[in-house]
Amino acid sequence: ILVLPGDGIGPEITAATLSVLETADRKFGLGLRIESADIGLKALQAQGTTLPEAVMARVPEVDGVILGPVSHYDYPSREKGGINPSGELRVKFNLYANIRPCLSRPELSILRKPMDLVVVRENTEGFYSDRNMFAGSGEFMPDPDLALSVRKISAAASERVARAAFRLARGRRCRVTAVHKANVLKLSDGLFLREVRKVAAEFPD
């Protein structure tokens, strides 16, 4: 497992994550091998880039990566070594499904009934410029009091993230809820919903 602590609270968060992994490793004999590398501002200071080539080369060689938060808004331009590690990793390795489990713990008090769900979010498109633009921010201000933003939704990306969700659901409770606003965003969310329904037809269970 490659640990990339990142910036700000990143080292603190990844250290806590590692303590959990190390406990699990001791209890279950997982045989985990942990290594770490610098990215972000620390790497920029030492190596002149926020994402060293050696790190990118190492990622496909390991079984998993723990990436801490990064302060990419504090980075210099790309020409001066400022590369957003999370965005670059997402694009380079086609990390299209952002999978977020939400599970309540029986030993902790909760306000609502127990929760056990997984959010599957498309991770390569949308409003963020590193997901929808070859160059530029994807935002425009025709005048000082008006801001516009471009959103990208494609059939291919919608189909594959839907398939990931249905495959995941098949191993759980066989239930998928598509979150959308197709009643208003008829073209973009309508396209997304159309692809989800196509995939749903392949999973009658």
Residue ranges and their predicted role:
Residues 2-25, 139-205:
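Glycine-rich phosphate/diphosphate-binding loop of Rossmann-like nucleotide-binding domains
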Residues 6-8, 39, 70, 104, ...:
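Short, ordered loop/turn segments at secondary-structure junctions
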Residues 27-53:
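N-terminal beta-loop-helix "entrance" segment that forms/cooperates
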Residues 31, 65, 175:
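Residue-level detector of anion-binding/catalytic polar loops
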Residues 6-10, 40, 68, 126, ...:
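Glycine-centered flexibility sites
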Residues 33-37, 100, 177:
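General small-molecule cofactor/ligand-binding pocket signal
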